[in-house]
């Protein structure tokens, strides 16, 4: 009965083949985030910003400024000079930083953080900032290895008498035959390599490669000459390797300095019970010492001088940078002058505000107003920055953004409803207008309509208040709260 029930959803094709639908666990759903539509800065070849390109609408001057910044980044001429994005909330500062990361590509490290992330009870604030700096600095290691690659045609271990035992025998060496399109070669390998071959479960007909320096063995797959050997087999078939059996391969590995820090900050303890228990009890985050980082920097410098590695400065994006305090700003000033410094992009939506960490004058812990500065940043850090201002979106730009988000989210909407959402975005904020999109699609679907109408948007406007209307409601109830 269970078999009949499970096959009820199967589809019978005209050819007579029964196809089963894929299980739900294998179906991939693409999540739609706030900035899913951003694919780049949307610049022309001459560096001018197009009105609507690569998912970006508006912010012409800011995009052109970031385009110049991008040219300096790619030319390696912009270290130590951070970029500061300032503007009201909801004007696309985070979207600009993400577009910059899209333009740089996946090979360039991009580390995004929020200013409030530095406050932790386990790790110092400067340590959190330092680890983010190291995450944004990549190291491209190029290594040339000599390997033997081919299809296994012979695998013969040779035994010899064990001198330590009167009866047992040991493996003295192993004969391995490898075949490629160009020729064959027979290798005589050490017994330790035979152990690696056994761990990989290599048999005749498998395609393997053996590193000449380390003796490491890697099974690539089964030769496609044996593909018709079985009707059903959970095996990956690969073609016969081309070229000679003995060849040189250039391997490129991309790591960050933070990866090297973590690999060296966690030494492997002993295998006794006390070491194991100590590793289990020890919790929290590992703090990397400055001494260890200096040693790693020396090794990295040596690799760069030898031509083995190449330094790839990435981008560190600190959103809500006004949430940092004076200690963090002092650390930032020093870190920006370091020769191993990434490109730093800051963002703030504050005007003249108090610098965090300056509210106390130090006299018996008494509070003071603190130091007020533009964007909540010290003047010495502001002097280092190149500042880019973002503008509020116009009604036409809000309308085009709403239309684009409807296409991304797959929501059918009428032109009148788009105009209504554009009015709401101009009156309150762009975020409020975009937040009404998905609920409006659900409301219209529940009503059995094919597209979102003006009535659906008005209904949601009554259900969900924007920030301005909510503040107005609170002001109207102040007298009531004072009386009771």
Swiss-Prot record:
Gene3D superfamilies: 1.10.8.60, P-loop containing nucleotide triphosphate hydrolases (3.40.50.300), RuvB-like helicase, domain II (2.40.50.360). Residues 1-27 are annotated as: Disordered. It comes from the Eukaryota. Its EC number is 3.6.4.12. It is an enzyme of class 3 (hydrolase). Keywords: Activator, ATP-binding, Chromatin regulator, DNA damage, DNA repair, Helicase, Hydrolase, Nucleotide-binding, Nucleus, Transcription, Transcription regulation. It catalyses: ATP + H2O = ADP + phosphate + H(+). PANTHER family: RUVB-RELATED REPTIN AND PONTIN. This is RuvB-like helicase 1. It comes from Cryptococcus neoformans var. neoformans serotype D (strain JEC21 / ATCC MYA-565).
